[in-house]
């Protein structure tokens, strides 16, 4: 009986050895095999100490949610949902006008429609709230908003004496029928000279805009004499009526983000009267004291992340090869690289025309920041 059991046991051992050899031949098992080892997803793995840049692109978009903003592409939908959450959690602590502004923005995003005139007016009314939230958060930003050119000129005299930089969103024309806003980046130099770089998100050649720049230059000369230099950079990223308030706020913040570049431009403007040796777009305007430059020739790619049109990105790429592939992600929470081309695709909507709604998502984000600050 015992002999019979031993024979059966040896037979089983031989069978096990044969099975192991068979599986090894398939690459399964053994210390060197990895085909069936447990896989740890990258997102759950500890980050590499050598990692300095984010992955090139995010995973595929999640399927449309059942939220009230499901008509929007994934990226702007998430920003709308984040604003909606902020209204619910922080709205009772915020100024009523800011809450109404947030709700009007959410309503526009929910309908997935172009910006209305009433929302543009709310941009103007609530701009001080948005400006304050950023100025309180960013060191030495010195961001202000001005409802008239006269208010800006009056306050500029005070800043002129401090020697501090100033960034501002300024209404370009005294005419109450004209709402257009632009961003001003200002440096007050030790020599007593002041340099101003105006950032026009649309076209400075627009007949409704250029008279404001010429008049501003005249008033600056009257106030400061020869101790003032004034440049205008037209980005032509804004292609729709309205939107200038949020665009200009974004440009003031972008100038702060790119302040080392702007510091050098201001030095050039003070010492040489030009920026990077670039010739003005219009000799006639230059004779009037308005040094006009084309934005696609020199502005960093970050200034075009909210551009409405593919054509604008193509022009930027033609003037600055490689710019359309530049990583323009922002914020501490940014995980993936984001090129201008990819952003244009991810924020594209089809309404009366096909264009990027990135600036609308930026409005939602800026309002959320104001609610949470």
Curated annotation (Swiss-Prot):
Catalysed reactions, as listed in the record: L-threonyl-[protein] + acetyl-CoA = O-acetyl-L-threonyl-[protein] + CoA; L-seryl-[protein] + acetyl-CoA = O-acetyl-L-seryl-[protein] + CoA
Broad class of the protein's primary localization: secreted
InterPro entries: Ser/Thr_acetyltransferase, YopJ-like
Keyword flag Lyase: no
Disruption phenotype: No longer inhibits growth of bacteria encoding this gene on tomato cv. Hawaii 7998.
Residues bound to CoA: 180, 239-240, 308-311
A GO cellular-component term linked to this record: extracellular region
Region of interest: Disordered: 29-89
Active site: 180, 200, 244
EC category name: transferase
UniProt feature, compositional bias: Low complexity: 43-54
Pfam family, one: Acetyltransf_14
Family: Belongs to the acetyltransferase YopJ family.
Function: Serine/threonine-protein acetyltransferase translocated into infected cells, which mediates acetylation of serine and threonine residues of host target proteins. Induces a hypersensitive response (HR) in tomato cv. Hawaii 7998 (S.lycopersicum) carrying the resistance gene.
Protein's name in the database: Serine/threonine-protein acetyltransferase AvrRxv
């Amino acid at each position: 009986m015992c002999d019979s059991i031993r024979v059966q046991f040896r037979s089983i051992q031989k069978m096990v050895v044969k099975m192991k050899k068979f599986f090894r031949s398939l690459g399964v098992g053994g210390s060197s095999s990895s085909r069936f080892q447990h896989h740890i997803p990258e997102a759950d793995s500890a980050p590499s100490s050598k990692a300095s840049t984010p992955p090139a692109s995010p995973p595929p978009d999640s399927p449309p949610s059942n939220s009230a903003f499901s008509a929007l592409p994934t990226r702007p939908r998430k920003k709308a949902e984040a604003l909606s959450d902020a209204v619910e959690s922080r709205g009772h602590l915020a100024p009523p006008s800011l809450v109404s502004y947030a709700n009007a923005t959410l309503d526009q995003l929910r309908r997935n429609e172009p910006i209305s005139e009433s929302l543009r007016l709310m941009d103007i009314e609530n701009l001080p709230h948005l400006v304050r939230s950023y100025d309180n958060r960013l060191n030495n930003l010195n961001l202000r908003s001005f409802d008239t050119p006269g208010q800006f000129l009056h306050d500029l005299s005070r800043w002129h004496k401090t020697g501090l930089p100033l960034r501002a969103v300024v209404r370009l024309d005294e005419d109450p029928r004209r709402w257009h806003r632009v961003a001003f980046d200002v440096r007050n130099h030790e020599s007593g000279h002041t340099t101003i770089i105006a950032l026009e998100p649309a076209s400075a050649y627009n007949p409704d805009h250029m008279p404001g720049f010429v008049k501003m230059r005249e008033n600056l000369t009257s106030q400061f004499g020869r101790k003032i230099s004034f440049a205008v950079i037209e980005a032509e990223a804004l292609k729709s009526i309205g939107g200038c308030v949020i665009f200009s706020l974004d440009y003031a913040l972008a100038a702060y983000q790119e302040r080392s570049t702007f510091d050098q431009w201001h030095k050039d403007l003070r010492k040489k009267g030009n920026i990077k040796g670039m010739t003005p777009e219009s000799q006639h305007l230059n004779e009037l004291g308005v040094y006009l430059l084309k934005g696609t020739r020199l502005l960093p790619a970050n200034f075009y992340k909210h551009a409405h049109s593919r054509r604008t990105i193509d022009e930027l790429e033609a003037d600055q090869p490689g710019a359309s592939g530049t990583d323009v992600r922002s914020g501490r929470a940014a995980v993936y690289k984001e090129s201008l081309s990819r952003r244009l695709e991810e924020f594209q909507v089809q309404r009366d025309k096909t264009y990027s709604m990135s600036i609308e998502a930026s409005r939602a984000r800026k309002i959320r920041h104001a609610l949470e600050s």
